[in-house]
Amino acid sequence: MRQRTSEDVQSAVRTFSLSTLITASRAFLAFSLFFLIVKDEYSIALSIFLLGVASDFLDGHIARKRGEDSSLGGFFDHSCDALFVTTGFLALAISGSETYFLIGLIPISFIEYSWDFITNRTPLTPTFIGRFNGISYYVLIGIWLGVKALDAEISFEFENVLVFCARFLCFTTLFSIFVGIQNRIAVKF
């Protein structure tokens, strides 16, 4: 049996840290967000969404400030982000918004991005396009929810802009996946 090291103990302590609990709350908020959107409770869903955004902002800040940041914590944070935005887009698609094409791409992109961490425990290395996509997923869901929560009559043109943005995100997500795969292949050869 392997001896426990101080690194094992520190890792276990970080597992149950405040920042990790804040990150985990986003996973629970994702399911609430999903059901509220599907039930057309957009005002409450927007509030839950904003809590999720706040948790995403706070968890990393708190982890760094308290010395709780780790590769595993970063992976967990990105996992919760992917779950949160994927369930948000899934719920919006079920409620009639044209976001269905992102539902499969976001998890694929997350797996591609996380592959080296999962297989080799190498640190996650975000790219510009990956950051752009991650932020844009949140922004697009927020705009869609804001419009629905306000029960605003949106013009056909504005709806087309939202659909265009979602399709553009589909393109940039595919681009990010292919760049990640290409970089991984280039490193091996």
Identify what each model region corresponds to:
Residues 20-75, 88-91, 98-107, 156-175:
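Membrane-embedded alpha-helical segments that form the functional core of polytopic membrane enzymes
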